[in-house]
Amino acid sequence: MNEQELCKKKLIDLSRQANRKGIVLFSDFLNLNELNIYHQNEKFFETKTEASGGVPFAERQIVAFIPDALYYEWQFPIAYLEIVPSYPKFAEKLGHRDILGSLMNLGVDRSKLGDIVICDDKYFLICEESMASYFIENLDKIRHTVVKLSPVTADALEQQQKFEEKDGIITSNRLDSMIACVYKFSRS
């Protein structure tokens, strides 16, 4: 059985379990390929579904399987952590791969991690609620920078995200043309 079939069966099984038990069940964080499989197979689910990555435009998302007879409030099991250098004066500039590498070095499965958001000199991690305390206790160094993690709210993270609207003329419906227009790069 290939990876796509396995993902499809896993999602359908979660839907059946949620329907049978009458409770909301959640997937792990799904990557873009798994989200594509989820969207292609929504017609096979026995429950309603909803996907969220914790912030708008999140790349990695959790899917909630919601039974029809649901009568209680629920929330996505998502935690938001801010990564702060303990000694800002001596801190290195960290990148996405530095943070992800340190998290993976803790032996954590990638499916427990959501997006890593970097805004200016602030770093945020979106993860499953069940893993937040583990990261707070065990992640103390990224590259050569000593760090501490602290929980924040989704609002604090959303305030850090900045979007910019760009106007321009795109000569063809190709990705390289769009990137050239937005970032003022030559296509060559």
Regions found by a protein language model. Give the residues of each.
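Ferredoxin-like alpha/beta domains used as RNA- or RNAP-binding modules
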Residues: 1-185
